[in-house]
């Protein structure tokens, strides 16, 4: 992971972080806490959130906390990966999206075993910066590659990026189209399903989603 200084419209290299020489550290996305001292990293293939500290002088190369983003052990035939990570405008919560793939050679039309396509919600300790998993909620689709939180902190929208055939918790095969899933965000940071906007028959992918 590379860090750069930004000044007068120009970037200059500051530091590089590769815990354990980069082994087991597949950083995909990160977000800076509003206090400017904490960084939260989505570590893709490990399905983890990592927490480290930063100050005006240096970036800590010690990962202070590692926490799984999953609600259960990975199921047979499933490969899990995280994607986006965003901190709530209040600074009290951090959200990470989980994606489930087939662990074999997946081709369009094949059925993906039941896995976790969901948003993980973590509560941030205001004193220490450490996180605690408080919720995993399904996005009602497949491969939520990206999501956004509106500036008021009351809504979260997730983009289920690809159509898929997937087994549900009952073992039934269901067809999941490309879709946008809207959640309400409660005062406790937890998400509540609000609306799902699907695009059946679409062969395009939803890579990004945001609020205007």
Could you tell me what each predicted segment is?
Residues 162, 171-188, 192-212:
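Blade-level signature of beta-propeller repeat domains, shared across WD40, Kelch, NHL, RCC1
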Residues 44-45, 54, 90, 99-101, ...:
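Short loop/turn segments immediately following the C-termini of beta-strands
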Residues 13, 46-48, 61, 114-118, ...:
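A detector of repeated loop/turn-to-beta-strand junctions in beta-rich toroidal repeat architectures
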Residues 3-11, 52-62, 121-129, 182-192:
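Short loop/turn segments immediately following beta-strands, especially the blade-tip
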Residues 14-21, 65-75, 132-138, 194-198:
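A short beta-strand motif characteristic of beta-propeller blades
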Residues 96-114, 159-175:
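Short, conserved, GDST-rich strand-edge loop motifs in beta-rich repeat architectures
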Residues 21-38, 70-91, 100, 142-153, ...:
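Beta-rich, blade/repeat-based domains predominating
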């Amino acid at each position: 992971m590379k860090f750069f200084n930004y000044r007068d419209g120009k970037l200059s290299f500051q530091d590089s972080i590769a815990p354990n020489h980069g082994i087991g550290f597949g950083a995909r996305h990160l977000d800076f806490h509003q206090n400017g001292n904490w960084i939260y990293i989505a570590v893709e293939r490990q399905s983890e959130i990592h927490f480290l500290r930063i100050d005006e002088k240096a970036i800590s190369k010690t990962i202070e906390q590692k926490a799984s983003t999953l609600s259960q052990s990975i199921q047979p035939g499933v490969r899990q990966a995280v994607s986006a990570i965003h901190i709530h405008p209040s600074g009290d919560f951090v959200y990470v999206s989980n994606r489930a793939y087939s662990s074999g050679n997946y081709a369009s039309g094949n059925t993906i075993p039941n896995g976790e396509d969901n948003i993980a919600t973590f509560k941030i300790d205001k004193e220490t910066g450490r996180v605690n998993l408080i919720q995993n909620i399904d996005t009602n689709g497949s491969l939520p590659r990206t999501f956004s939180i509106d500036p008021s902190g009351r809504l979260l929208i997730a983009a289920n990026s690809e159509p898929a055939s997937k087994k549900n918790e009952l073992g039934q095969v269901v067809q999941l189209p490309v879709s946008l899933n809207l959640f309400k965000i409660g005062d406790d940071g937890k998400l509540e399903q609000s609306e799902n906007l699907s695009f059946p028959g679409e062969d395009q992918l939803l890579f990004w989603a945001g609020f205007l």
